[in-house]
Amino acid sequence: MRLSDFDFALPEGLVAQAPVTPRDASRLMVLAPEEGSPAHRGFADLPELLAPGDLLVFNDTRVIPARLLGHKASGGKVELLLCEPLEGGLGRRWRAMGQASKPIREGAVLTFDGLEARVDDVEGEGFYRVTLDRQGPELEAALGRAGRIPLPPYIRRAPDAEDAARYQTIWARAPGSAAAPTAGLHFTEPLLARLAARGIRRTAVTLHVGPGTFLPIRGDDLDLHRMHGERYEVSPAAAAELAATRARGGRIVAVGTTSVRTLESAWRDGAVAAGPGRTELFIRPGHPFHAVDAMVTNFHLPRSTLLVLVCAFGGQGRVLAAYREAVARGYRFFSYGDAMLLLRR
């Protein structure tokens, strides 16, 4: 399977540079199995498009100000992106991406406005393992002072105060992500209330978003691509809610590709298993979906693992045709863009 089969032309002007207000004012393209052509709705219409008894599964990870600009002991400039908490939550040990004018050496001490990071291991390809000089609430305060919201590079502006709130879901709880689970950015409290009033339930899993989600695929042969691991957790309450929904015939509606990967990674012996894990699952056409019946997702980059996942779920030809229609109709793409609802039943 070739990466070039997952390409499409996207005018730069369709890459959303800022979110819409309110959050649920974004557009929603709907791909249903019984309909040949996509339907075009607003995201606020979501309650009408789901059924009582369906279960929405959110990713409750919280984006941290993970981008750090500082210097080495020599005075040379250095940039670090905290990618994966190695101890869970806001611990001291992290996997990070780094860049500097000269190589970053093992044992180097990097300083970021008072926050220090010691380089424990140089993994290669720009990845490092580092130990920070604080953890928990002290680390959260230090990141709030020294860190920046890690907006994706296709948002061609510096992050501002609005991004601190808008590049975060309204239910974000567990700190640890270097990117937002962007399908969740469209939800508002009034929309959640309308969904609940219709009998649509919700639960949450946690996957801390890192390079496994946002790094590009190198080379054209998908069989050679290896995902970077990302940590996830499914609570016993979420696992029970998922099992109960299936037992009564409801649909599992994953909000975002990270929720899809969490649920599919945690599938064991006919059910989603509770507990922590680390996933390197690369979902591509031919993947046998077990845990997910529908998904909400944004419009993704050409030639990305996220687009490959959506094609696996909705059908490669059908999804790429829908993307071409989205371009023709002026849908907004990527993190701050519009959304799709894909239904398998």
Curated annotation (Swiss-Prot):
Pfam families hit by this protein: Queuosine_synth (PF02547)
Keyword Chloroplast applies: no
Subcellular location(s) per record: Cytoplasm
Catalytic activity: 7-aminomethyl-7-carbaguanosine(34) in tRNA + S-adenosyl-L-methionine = epoxyqueuosine(34) in tRNA + adenine + L-methionine + 2 H(+)
InterPro entries found in the cross-reference section: QueA, QueA_dom1, QueA_dom2, QueA_sf
Predominant subcellular localization, coarse grouping: cytoplasm
MF term (GO), any: S-adenosylmethionine:tRNA ribosyltransferase-isomerase activity
GO terms under biological process: queuosine biosynthetic process; tRNA wobble guanine modification
GO CC terms of this entry: cytoplasm
EC number from the UniProt entry: 2.4.99.17
Enzyme class per UniProt: transferase
Pathway noted in the entry: tRNA modification; tRNA-queuosine biosynthesis
The entry's keywords: Cytoplasm, Queuosine biosynthesis, S-adenosyl-L-methionine, Transferase
Oligomeric and partner information: Monomer.
Known role: Transfers and isomerizes the ribose moiety from AdoMet to the 7-aminomethyl group of 7-deazaguanine (preQ1-tRNA) to give epoxyqueuosine (oQ-tRNA).
Family affiliation: Belongs to the QueA family.
Name by which UniProt lists this protein: S-adenosylmethionine:tRNA ribosyltransferase-isomerase
Lineage: Bacteria, Pseudomonadati, Myxococcota, Myxococcia, Myxococcales
